[in-house]
């Protein structure tokens, strides 16, 4: 129902906006919550969804996500392969503007073409820069909030709760990678205008096309994120 959808959405947004915890933990919590809600939905146990929502608000849920991430931490090689694969999925979408394809190819080259160790180095350097110089973590959080808000509306009607939340997480990941690529291109600089420009270009390609939104959702159903990997 629409009321249930609003409750789930509100609770997820509450978790995402709680800055006492790292964004990584918050993402793990909303993926975990969506994963368990999906299970209840599939088994037609919607009456127990309240309990799922409450469980993911607790300290033990945060502890659980932290522990899972420690145990399931992908290797440098796996992380590079996973990131590259997720980025390449953007080529499966309908191309609306030529300059978008150019941006994707250039970004892919900058990020992934030098192998796993180079990608790890780039990611660590960017993270360090972002911490010191920029409010990119807050921008990423706001993007997630926006995407959950936008994508989640129909989730309870079509039963694709996990796919919709995964889509919000992957969309934010894609934009984060585009920021990272531009930062490399600029030799360690990224202006607020460029941050906004890349969000705009992504939205223009993906969100302004129903066909692309539908394709992306199908990809989410095909390539499910093991939620604890974040």
Model regions: which residues?
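Short, small-residue-biased leader/transition segments that mark boundaries at the very start
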Residues: 3-8
């Amino acid at each position: 129902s629409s009321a249930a959808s609003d409750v789930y959405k509100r609770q997820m947004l509450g978790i995402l906006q709680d800055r006492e915890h790292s964004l990584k933990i918050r993402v793990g919590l909303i993926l975990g919550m969506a994963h368990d809600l999906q299970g209840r939905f599939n088994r037609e146990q919607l009456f127990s969804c309240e309990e799922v929502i409450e469980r993911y608000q607790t300290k033990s849920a945060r502890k659980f996500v932290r522990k899972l991430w420690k145990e399931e931490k992908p290797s440098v090689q796996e992380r590079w392969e996973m990131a590259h694969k997720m980025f390449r999925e953007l080529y499966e979408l309908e191309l609306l503007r030529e300059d978008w394809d150019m941006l994707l190819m250039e970004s892919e080259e900058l990020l992934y073409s030098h192998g796993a160790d180079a990608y790890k180095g780039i990611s660590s350097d960017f993270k360090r820069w972002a911490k010191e110089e920029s409010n990119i973590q807050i921008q990423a959080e706001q993007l997630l909030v926006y995407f959950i808000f936008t994508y989640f509306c129909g989730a309870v009607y079509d039963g694709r709760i996990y796919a919709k939340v995964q889509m919000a997480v992957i969309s934010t990941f894609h934009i984060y990678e585009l920021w990272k690529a531009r930062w490399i291109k600029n030799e360690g600089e990224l202006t607020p205008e460029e941050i906004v420009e890349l969000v705009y270009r992504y939205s223009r390609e993906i969100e302004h096309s129903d066909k692309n939104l539908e394709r992306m959702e199908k990809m989410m159903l095909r390539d499910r994120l093991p939620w604890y990997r974040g």
